[in-house]
Amino acid sequence: KYYLNFIKSIKNIDEKLLLQITNLISEKIKKKSQIFVAGNGGSSSVANHFLCDFNKGVMLSSRYKLKPKIISLSNSIEMITAISNDISYDEIFTLQLKNYVRKGDCIICFSCSGKSKNILNLIKYANQNKIDVILFQGFGSKAKNIKTKFYINLKHENYGITEDIFSSTMHVMSQYIRAQYTAKNQIL
């Protein structure tokens, strides 16, 4: 049943929207913009995996023509615990972003519920500073008062399926970009 639910949910993703997101990411990489990724729990693993597949995979597949600048805000346990302890867990992503973000950068958030205060604060900060936001959400409705350039809601309440789809869409995007630079699209 898990697998069938996974297949059903992944088929509900709007392919045109996913392609638009992938093209935005590709453009940001070509312009040498930074792309920040963030998530909590299992979604933080997706954010960190995103960093790996793009920074290494895309760079090598493009034979160094593309050099992605992916920064995971979920990656440094030292920063996360210092900010949590000294300021607030709700600021673990925003405070890091303030240190690095530049005009033209982009943020990608992975959130099962879409209600995590640290993710919402990050998106609000990005909105205030005109930074493009892409939000992948598992279930529930989009929080009020936040704006995203692109938004995908999987509408599935199983955390495992949601996080598997987050991971799968990340692979689809990275491999699509990689295939553009690989002979005969060998990756796909």
Predicted region positions:
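Generic N-terminal amphipathic, Lys/Arg-enriched alpha-helix
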Residues: K1-I13
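A short, well-structured juxtamembrane/interface segment
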Residues: I13-K31
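Glycine-rich, small/polar surface segments that engage phosphate groups of diverse ligands
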Residues: E27-Y100
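Glycine-centered short loops/turns at secondary-structure junctions
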Residues: K32, G104, K130-I131
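Short glycine/serine/threonine-rich phosphate/pyrophosphate-binding segments
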Residues: S43-N48, K115-L122
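A charged, well-structured terminal subsegment
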Residues: N99-Y100, I161-L188
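Short beta->alpha connector loops at strand-helix junctions that form conserved
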Residues: S111, Q137, I152-G160
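Short, glycine/polar-rich helix-capping loops at beta-to-alpha or helix-loop-helix junctions
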Residues: L135-T148
